[in-house]
Amino acid sequence: MGSCWSDGSYAGGGMVGVGGGANSSAATPNDAVDYYLKSRGYNGLFSQIELSFSASNLRDRDVISKSDAMVVVYTKGRDGTLAELFRSEVVLNSLNPKWIKNFTIGYQFEIVQTLLFRVYDIDTQFQNSKEELLKLDEQQFLGEATCTLSEVVTKSNRTIALELMRKEGVAAQTQPQHNGKLIVHAEESLASKTNTEIVFRGLNLESKDTFSKSDPFLVISKIVEHGTPIPVSKTEVLKNDPNPLWKPVSLSVQQVGSKDSPLVIECLDFNGNGNHDLIGKVQKSLSDLEKLHLAGQGINLALPTGVGHKHEDRVLKSQLFVDKFTETVQHTFLEYLASGFELNFMVAIDFTASNGNPRLPDSLHYIDPTGRLNAYQRAIVEVGEVLQFYDSDKRFPAWGFGARPIDIPVSHCFNLNGSSTYCEVDGIQGIMNAYNGALFNVSFAGPTLFGPVINAAATIASDSLAQSAKKYYVLLIITDGVITDLQETRDSIVSASDLPLSILIVGVGGADYKEMEVLDGDKGEKLESSSGRIASRDIVQFVALRDIQYGEVSVVEALLAELPTQFLTYMRNRNITPTTTTPSST
């Protein structure tokens, strides 16, 4: 496993790409609409998780009776700061309490959500007080435990048993050895699984074009408090059609908030410059749309006129109908994880000469003696910290490219650990150790080629697919420059698009990454191989570190936001469903 080569192919294959060979790679109106929506916040996967709590063998701090326990939940930031999120009710006189009150939290794949749980014995004099008014420093501390939300949801039965420990900073000898266990169980909200399929039809849409009919499409957005509506779905663009019948659109109840949450449905006339004209809009909930479907009635679009207090809506003759409204329950990302599917992390690091001499402070590979991470180390750690929870053995393939290892010619895919036979290392720290060792055991060279490392990752994914393994692979490529094998890289990506593989690319340094962005399907360009084959799905996500390092979105969030969707697209394209597994003991 892990052999590298440079012939632009990989052992094994995959299905022929959906769409066939003769399609153009030019961006279509529908691709441009995708990019337009993403610029307005259409992104990411969000699931509502309900956590329930119980405990066993709590420490008894009461003299006459047993403890009266309450659990408090905090979120823990990267800097260690705590923010309280939830308090349970108080369960009286029990060392094995089962709390009734549950805690609901939004699961976000791209963020490490660290939770801290503290259990208190509530003093008798406060038992008639509301939980939220209790002063915790006046209660007896029974123990605390911490874990990430990812650790809970990746368990086969979504249950984790945590040993309650003393508070951080309290001397070990002052604390009894046994404080009991806290059991945390997660359930995904049904709203996350409930999918609504809707077919919209327009009638007598007004023309916004002078010499032709409009090219209409719909954008469905949810209304958020104190903010611009956020797009959650859209239809395709239909050319020159005043009476369009669009393909079905899918919405989960979770996406929109609830079935009664108001939605803005905009009908727009597509323009190639991105400035789409508003034909008209309506505001309706899913419940309203269902009623329109059952009644067979249309609703008139309205066009806002005027501004400020003079704002009015002009009701149009143009109408919108709901020809189909069905609700189904779909498999979710978390269901696949619970049934045993894993995400396997891989990394490939650029050692080309343009990075600079690693012994000098101006090098992108410079190891700061103060411990401050360079850009390569940051990307490895931050992406790895998220993905490691989804890989049971935490053995990660790691490669370098663009350098001359000891005793061999320049290689565009060599094992980072220095081995000639295997590429895996143990854990994120193993990657960091192999990276640090390689810096001074290879000679930086060039050029910058991606094809060989993508082919190496594709080989592993292809072999896993042949064995029907429940694995999906994520390759992180970190680079400082523009690739010189653009077409070969396109070919590799198109071939890999049928495999259980996604590719994350981080650009470090000040290079011009326009060519790199072509590989990322976010901007509506379909990747085409040299043989004319079209990628069956988008598997690449690219970010330039300089573009976001001072912004509000972290490198990890920008890279990983689309990964669950890419995973689900692969599973649904191949009709792979989660299988029920027997719950294992914690």
From Swiss-Prot:
Protein family per UniProt: Belongs to the copine family.
Species the sequence originates in: Arabidopsis thaliana (Mouse-ear cress)
Keyword flag DNA repair: no
Subcellular localization, as worded in the UniProt entry: Cell membrane
Phenotypic consequence of gene deletion: No visible phenotype; due to partial redundancy with BON1 and BON3. Bon2 and bon3 double mutant has no visible phenotype. Bon1 and bon2 double mutant is seedling-lethal when grown at 22 degrees Celsius. Bon1, bon2 and bon3 triple mutant is seedling-lethal at any temperature.
Any single Gene Ontology cellular-component annotation: plasma membrane
Keyword set, alphabetical order: Calcium, Cell membrane, Lipoprotein, Membrane, Metal-binding, Myristate, Plant defense, Repeat
Subunit structure: Interacts with BAP1 and BAP2.
Protein role: Negative regulator of cell death and defense responses. May repress a number of R genes and may have effects in promoting growth and development. May function in membrane trafficking and in fusion of vesicles with plasma membrane.
Any GO molecular function: calcium-dependent phospholipid binding
Transmembrane stretches, start-end: none
Name of the encoding gene: BON2
Domain C2: 25-164, 176-303
Lineage of the organism: Eukaryota, Viridiplantae, Streptophyta, Embryophyta, Tracheophyta
Protein name (database record): Protein BONZAI 2
Tissue expression summary: Expressed in roots, leaves and stems. Expressed in young growing tissues.
